[in-house]
Amino acid sequence: MKRDTDISQEVALIWNTANDVLRDIFQRTEYPDIIYPMVLIRRIEGVMIAKTEQLKEELESQLSKVDKKTQEQILNGKILQEIKFNNTSGKTLAIIADEGESSIKNNFIAYLNGYTDNIKMGYVFEELVRKFSEANNAEAGEHYTPREVIDLMTHMLNMDEKAIKDGQLVTIYDPACGSGGMLSAAKEFVEEKINPNAKVVLYGQEVNDKTWAVAQADLLLKGETAYITKGDTLYEDGAAGEQFDFMLSNPPYGKSWKKIQKKVLANSNGRFDVGQPRSSDGQLLFTLHMISKMKPAELGGSAIAIVHNGSPLFSGDAGSGESEIRRYILENDWLETIVALPTELFYNTGIATYIWLIRNNKPKHRKGKIQLINAVDFWKPMKRSLGNKRRRIDETQINEIIQIHKTFDTGPYSKIFELEDFAFRKVFLDLEETDENGNPITEEKEVTVAQNKLNDTLLIKTADEKKRLAELKDKKGKEGEFTFNLNPESELATKHKTADASITIRKALDGNKLGLKASINVPKIVKDTEYIPWKDDKEAFLKKEVEKKWQITKEEKGYEIPFTRHFYVYQPLRQAIEVVYEIGLLEKENTLLMNELGINL
């Protein structure tokens, strides 16, 4: 990140102070709880004192004409008007320290208040957040996304294509904003790369109380126009009814939402109607939430960059919540690009991660198309690992990825697909079992036959069959078994998928009542499913892939994005002679080493 202000001395001073003063008294993970508030408080005091002295000079003639109480009222009013906060306790940190420990608590409580605009201290605060996050790497992934990932996401949003003009309002939103790093970086990008005169307003939400407070402090110290709400985005939508120009986020992945599922669905307000992912992983809910905040395309539309692990690409079968969410995004032609990032890039996980770029204002040449970018090899090793983070993406590599995205062409790291390339049919089949000679295998099945449907169910042609049918219906006749041919067009034959079968009916008499029990031999059916690419002819596919006689009973459409499959490169196995030769060399080397040790084999 580029900065015009050198903050290294201030950061070093605070960092070293924390190590010198707090060590052995507090755990390292507790340092931020003490340092963050003190940095904020000290900055507030500095701004307040400087503004008070400035106003005293500017209002000297006016103040000299009134009493002390009126002077304080005038000064306090002016300070509130210009810097939006003031401290009327009449104390400073130095005064509180001088007054001794006995009264420090009460004096300190009375003293606390307010935030202000100072870009240098804002950067100091952000840098401290980063350093403490890295030092406490087990916690870092909860609220801190590596800067290079944020930079890549902001570049890929293609904000410059919006031609942001002077004074134009630009809204940026992060529903899982953590310490606010993504929001700050996005604003910097607009001001440094696009238009410094744009009016950028930041919106965010964070569920963790401490992290929310850090985000508030960081953004307020920088003087950002920001609205950060506290609460769970999934059931406490802090931006209800709002729409934004740009959205970016790194929500928790692989995190269960089972405990809050009822509250989420009760407060969805239509956000999650298209489908819900399994309760063990709620990350796709954040995607749907952000989509619900998109501006209509006719009003300029919106762009979203969100980080996911691999699960949202393929988890869930056809008809599942995950598949239906993918279907919703793809069939609306909102998915523009997915970038596979290097592993070991984040602080608390080494797994594969992906940036999804979603927009409802895709340029004409991208409509109906999806770009997959394989950037897993775009990394440099870190000099010192930070938890699971052992790799970084440098500025040159970020620019290479951005260029691949802009070029929008097929190559070693990029592939272009149509929407239906990711669709498939899940076909449910009934397969008829056959013996080794290919003859159908049948099994006896109990069925119900109503007396008033006997004529329709049975195939009666001969006089003998008519006679036996009459005997079967006769309530005064003999009990016994009667065998007939089954009418192939009957409801019973259709239901049990047997057109050429006999039916055995057992007649029983109970007084004046006629009881009928029947059984038929039906083909032995095995249930099966086949997954067929949507663009393939299903009949041709089944004829080629399924040997047994089949009947389609049901179909479902699903979507998955098998990212790694599309970039798989076959590595041929080595020749056996090469392997044998190397084994021989190793055996000779082993023998020499053993001989040197005086061991004869």
Residue ranges, per PLM feature:
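Non-catalytic, mostly N-terminal accessory regions of nucleic-acid modification and defense proteins
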Residues: 1-161, 227-238, 340-343, 367-374, ...
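Short, contiguous acidic/charged loop-to-helix segments that flank catalytic cores in large enzymes
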Residues: 25, 258-281, 310-320, 342-347, ...
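Short glycine/proline-enriched turns and hinge-like loops at secondary-structure junctions
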Residues: 28, 166, 240-241, 349-351
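Conserved Class I SAM-dependent methyltransferase catalytic core
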Residues: 30-43, 153, 216, 276-358
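Active-site catalytic pocket residues across diverse enzymes, especially alpha/beta-hydrolases
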Residues: 48, 190-194, 294
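Conserved S-adenosyl-L-methionine
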Residues: 139-249, 253-265, 284, 308-310, ...
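Feature representing long, continuous alpha-helical segments
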Residues: 184, 213, 249-251, 284-288, ...
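Flexible, glycine-/basic-rich loop-and-beta segments that form/coincide
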Residues: 347-446
